Amino acid sequence: ILDPFMGGGTSLIEAQRMGRNSIGIELQPDIARNSETLINIEHNDNCITKVITGDSRCYNINSLMEQFNIPAFQFVIMHPPYWDIIKFSDNINDLSNSHTLNEFLDSFGMVIDNTTKYLEKNRYCACVIGDKYANSQVIPLGFYCMNQFLERGFLLKAILVKNFGETKGKSNQQGIWRYRAI
């Protein structure tokens, strides 16, 4: 399993619990260190779990695969920043610091190009992302990101929609859709 937006390490923890080898790439060194500590609590001697600090747009994944004798990844899971809704760092390479939607999508496309070429044939890549609401309109980040995959020849297998009630991004605005519909 490859997670190019590792963040808190949830996918690596779950991979360990299932006995699956996993590699996570995180841009921010402090986040990578903290996540590695949490991941090591769930240590599983029966699988490889590796945390890498780097930029998923250009990290040399091939050398990593050679190091661990990995012929291909069987699953890639991407949970990128929701463009600029939450600024995760001051790093200019952080997708959450993209100045425009096109810049965000171009950078996201670079991650797709750099990671999915190592995906085993007939295997899957999942993208977890929410949409953005700004200037009285919905910006459908999920569909824009999905289109980045389609433009690269991926086949769409499913669109799963989950409404999270209370989140940091919604800031106590559970009734916002009712308000906007009126």
In which residue ranges do the predicted regions lie?
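Class I S-adenosyl-L-methionine-dependent methyltransferase catalytic core
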Residues: 1-182
